[in-house]
């Protein structure tokens, strides 16, 4: 209607005779056309780099093909992928707005949602279970054998800690009395400790660090697959990592989010199908030290892309288990529905496009 008035097809007086529904429909169509006109002549790819943080390890292995796509011109966006050794390095940057998105542990996302009063949203599940108990020796064959032992682990306050504690309790062990858990900030520190140990050392490690450690030390063996142990006592999906976005960024850039999720899905698909290419990228970017390690570990890393209702169902069930075991694991309370990113309405997209074009 707005464009029709401008073009002289409908006079202002005639436009007033349209019923409210027709007015609304005409207005929406006009807004869409206006956005299209504003977009004419602009590049299909945004010139703004999307700043994404990831941890060295499995949760970022599904992201690396974004860089390959960017190089060959098939990516919808430009990406600035930043790597960190520990999640607590990412959190302050995300809170300050120095990052747009991040791949972080699932429970940390819930905690951060509470801490920022809804300042982040989860867009996708990126990694399922990747944790294992490994031993340098042959004394552990079940959870019962862990009693009285020291366990080295990474991830205090995130998935490794809470999964280990949950499974110890489910198998009749008190994690505060029956075992001693020593935490290190990075998985690479744990593998170094295991390599230096003479015998009978025990650790909880994620892939690809399990593979890396075994390639260096043939005496290291996997004694417990924690995903299998989880499935034995729990009917929910074990989730290691999720990909989150700052809520304000998502509101202002719905088209960027849609383009990212399309690219991300392709990147994850490539990670599971093009093992050699992804392994080379993992070494190039620094996600894994050597391509040979990544190549052997990738099939065991449970890299996925799950969004929408499937994502919400899996994450909410997983967080419920953690909450029941320890409310602190998810920030003191379960996140509400706004925690889960959903595609905005057409009107919201149009208004965001108009707002951005005016900048």
Language-model features, listed with the residues they occupy:
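Short, glycine-/small- and polar/acidic-enriched structural segments
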Residues: 45-178, 182-183, 207, 221-224
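Short, low-complexity disordered leader/linker segments with a strong preference
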Residues: 1-49, 348-359
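Pocket-lining segment of extracytoplasmic ligand-binding domains
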Residues: 107-108, 189-283
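Conserved C-terminal helix/tail region of periplasmic/extracytoplasmic solute-binding proteins
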Residues: 316, 320-359
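Periplasmic-binding protein-like
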Residues: 125-135, 221-249, 299-300, 337-347
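Secondary-structure end/capping motifs
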Residues: 250-329
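A bilobed periplasmic-binding-protein/Venus flytrap-type ligand-binding module shared by bacterial periplasmic
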Residues: 65-67, 131-142, 237-256, 304-307
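Short, solvent-exposed loop/beta-turn-alpha elements that line the ligand-binding surface or hinge
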Residues: 70-78, 228-236, 303-311
């Amino acid at each position: 209607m707005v464009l029709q008035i401008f073009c002289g097809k409908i006079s202002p007086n005639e436009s007033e005779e349209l019923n409210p529904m027709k007015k609304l429909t005409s207005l929406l169509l006009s807004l869409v056309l206006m956005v299209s006109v504003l977009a004419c002549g602009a590049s299909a790819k945004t010139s703004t780099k999307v700043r994404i943080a990831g941890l060295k390890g499995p949760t970022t292995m599904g992201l690396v093909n974004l860089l390959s796509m960017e190089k060959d011109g098939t990516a919808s966006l430009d990406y600035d992928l930043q790597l960190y050794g520990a999640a607590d390095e990412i959190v302050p940057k995300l809170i300050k707005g120095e990052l747009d998105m991040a791949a972080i542990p699932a429970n940390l996302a819930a905690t951060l949602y509470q801490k920022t009063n809804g300042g982040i949203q989860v867009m996708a599940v990126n990694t399922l279970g990747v944790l294992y108990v490994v031993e340098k020796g042959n004394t552990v064959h079940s959870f019962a054998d862990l009693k009285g032992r020291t366990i080295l682990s990474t991830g205090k306050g995130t998935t490794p800690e809470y999964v280990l504690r949950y499974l110890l309790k489910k198998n009749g062990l008190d994690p505060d009395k029956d075992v001693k858990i020593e935490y290190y900030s990075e998985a690479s520190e744990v593998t170094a400790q295991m390599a230096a140990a003479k015998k009978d050392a025990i650790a909880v490690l994620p892939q690809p660090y399990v593979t890396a450690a075994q390639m260096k030390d043939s005496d290291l063996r996997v004694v417990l697959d924690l995903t299998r142990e989880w499935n034995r006592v729990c009917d929910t999906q074990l989730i290691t990592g999720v990909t989150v976005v700052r809520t304000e960024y998502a509101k202002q850039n719905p088209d960027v989010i849609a383009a990212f999720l399309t690219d991300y899905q392709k990147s994850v698909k490539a990670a599971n199908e093009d093992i050699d290419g992804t392994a080379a990228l993992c070494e190039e970017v620094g996600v894994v030290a050597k391509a040979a390690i990544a190549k052997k570990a990738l099939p065991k890393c449970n890299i996925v892309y799950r969004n929408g209702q499937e994502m919400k169902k899996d994450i909410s069930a997983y967080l419920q288990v953690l909450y029941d075991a320890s409310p602190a694991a998810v920030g003191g309370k379960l996140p509400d529905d706004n925690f889960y990113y959903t595609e905005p309405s057409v009107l919201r997209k149009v208004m965001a496009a108009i707002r951005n074009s005016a900048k």
